[in-house]
Amino acid sequence: MSTTKSDNYISELRKVIWPIERYENKKFLPMAFMMFCILLNYSTLRSIKDGFVVTDIGAEAISFLKTYIVLPSAVIAMIVYVKLCDILKQENVFYVITSFFLAYFALFAFVLYPNPDLVHPNPEAIESLSLAYPNFKWFIRIVGKWSFASFYTMAELWGTLMLSLLFWQFANQITKTDEAKRFYSMFGLLANLALPVTSLIIGYFLHEKTQIVAEHLKFTPLFVIMIISSLAVILTYRWMNKNVLTDPKLYDPALVKGKKAKAKMSLIESFKMIFTSKYVGYIALLLIAYGISVNLVEGVWKSKLKELHPTKEAYTMYMGQFQAYQGWVAIAFMIIGSNILRKVSWLTAAMITPLMMLITGIAFFAFIFFDSVIAMYLTGILASGPLALAVMIGTIQNVLSKGVKYSLFDATKNMAYIPLDKDLRVKGQAAVEVIGGRFGKSGGAIIQSTFFIIFPALGFVEATPYFASIFFVIVILWIYAVKGLNKEYQVLVNNTEK
């Protein structure tokens, strides 16, 4: 009897720790490996792209890249993707897009990166043009380091195309509903381990004691790892098409048919939906406020990080550490997030994100505005100066904002759709994705880049008071939107329960 109980306990424990059935490992493990490789590249690219742009062009250039290069490039990429889907099989579309990234990584690693003087315009000519046309100096400086700008753009597109689109489209295509409940949470846990692994890789290859290649080519091993990782993604995808999608026990094509496509709305239709429904408008405001507030702090933080770590190698190594912190915190929040949602009200759970942003934002900007006063009081108490402390608090703020995003923020936002009637729920979510997604991600960059065009003499250091003011206004609006949405939410929930 005791043996049976013990076996049952072990079986239940296994389902909690590893909810994948033995026969499903053939399907789950290759998909998890694919996601790990994609995220390994993603986190490596995120660390390197900022290191190149911030140290060689300036932190201010990031807002211009996001607004005027990345956003149009993403639109063009989606148009190309749709066209490819019309003329090729889905499997071949995956190969074409992944091979395009693979070819670019090889081009950058072995041609563009080793020969900056050969591929970039004369620095003196760029500087003289910047002085002659100060309102457009950041555009000119981006052109002056165009290969780094292209790398930044490709890094952003990797996350959009490879992770958000191709991987999840493939996963949704071949995963049954009952499998998804067990697979997807495990994908998140395993894939987030790629972030600390990235940190270890970057820390090793960029360390001053590591002498594998010439000093001016320190990043080459990282590019080679990304190329190998991209090849691994292609080969794993190929193996799955040959061995998993042909196994009737693991994949039934009939299940793919009949899946309803999500409602898609144009920009004008989305605006109409948001302005005519207060409830949907509140949800959109949450998403927009989150995106803008994160971008406003992130820009100032990266400029301070450059002051603390002025070289590409030092900056990228710090960003690698940041990725590790982000990975562990994301895993922790994924574990505790569901428990928080079960034990507190929707309002309390939804308030955690903006209040956390507000408190850490106040601390971050305080260390920037009152650095001399803080330095006077902290001398002899802490080894770190006010700059290092400001960067540390900015790091904590960014890590927490990303960790909370995937657990509490997204969960409470999605819970808000549940009490709506089916039509408003489907159309409202589509409207929020269009407006909230676009304006949230690019809103902060548009504010910053417009400010630098109008006031060309200012950089992040001089503009920080203005961006801090906008940040606090946005967060206060966010808190107002949470309170307003909670009132509407409670009314609908109570009506549903009656």
Swiss-Prot record:
Keywords: ATP-binding, Cell membrane, Disulfide bond, Membrane, Nucleotide-binding, Transmembrane, Transmembrane helix, Transport. Disulfide bonds join C37-C85. It is found in: Cell membrane. The keyword Membrane applies. It is a multi-pass membrane protein. The chain crosses the membrane at residues 34-54, 68-88, 93-113, 148-168, 185-205, 219-239, 280-300, 321-341, 349-369, 380-400, 439-459, 466-486. It comes from the Bacteria. Residues 1-33, 89-92, 169-184, 240-279, 342-348, 401-438, 487-498 are cytoplasmic. InterPro entries: ADP_ATP_car_bac_type, MFS_trans_sf. Residues 55-67, 114-147, 206-218, 301-320, 370-379, 460-465 are extracellular. ATP binds at G436, G437, R438, F439, G440, K441, S442. GO terms for molecular function: ATP binding; ATP:ADP antiporter activity. The keyword Coiled coil does not apply. GO terms for cellular component: plasma membrane. Its main location: membrane. Belongs to the ADP/ATP translocase tlc family. NCBIfam families: AAA. Provides the rickettsial cell with host ATP in exchange for rickettsial ADP. This is an obligate exchange system. This energy acquiring activity is an important component of rickettsial parasitism. This is ADP,ATP carrier protein 1. It comes from Rickettsia bellii (strain RML369-C). The gene is tlcA.
